[in-house]
Amino acid sequence: MFFVITIVLCFLSVAFYTLLERKVLSYTGNRVGPNKVRLRGVLQPIGDAVKLLFKSIFLPSSSNSVLFFVSPVASLTFSISLFILFFSSKFWRVPLSVLFFLSLIAISVFPPAFAGWASGSFYSKLGGSRNLVQTVRYEITLFIILLFPLWVFNYLTIHSKATVASFMLIVVISFFIVLLAETNRAPFDLAEGERELVSGFNTEFGGRGFVLFFLAEYAQIISMCLVGSSLFFCGYPVFFSFFTGLILVLLTRSAWPRLRYDALIIIIWTALLPTLNALIIFFVFL
């Protein structure tokens, strides 16, 4: 029963987070946003989901049918697993819970790449390969960030009593940048936002397949914001920092232009990694 309730809460969170995103983007662009569907637009995401679920499924003739259908399901499964495990208090308080979280994040890289390859489309393959390269490179930084509490405070659980963010603001900013890159959010949405990619790895997906990838992406955003708020802001109200992170993700999309691919790589190799390595040397050896 716990798993069913948590999955329903995950879907509702994604639904209303998308509504919040459309409202924030509309207000930043001096527009109104959804306001016609029942209760002044509150039920708009539910109506959109129902419409997409009843659309027909198109299978490209050159695609791998097994991976084409399995990839969206696997992507959503990994994202929901992150969401479920966060609310399982017995799990997150055990040793090495951060490593298990990193394992799920690492595995979640493969479904979009397999989806791009299985679609049989040049645009999908190119988008899937870019998504794989981008996320794998930023996972190195994510690994260092999430293991930082181990080196500094000798603990490796998500729920901790230490307040890290009070003197490690650089680590928190780095985590936010990695969050945007790992979840393909602006300004790092290069796997599906570039003109030559059409829609990236999910170009050939519509209806239910698109819904599953959509739910997986937003569920991963919410999960990573929850983990970041618990890991770095335990001395403060966790939900305040959690909602602040969600709003910052939306404001970044509305205010920051998309970066070039070379700038994406330069940030990781010349800014984030050297800075974090210097912090590790400072806290561990000094």
State where each predicted segment sits:
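Core, highly hydrophobic multi-pass alpha-helical transmembrane subunits of bioenergetic inner membranes
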Residues: 1-286
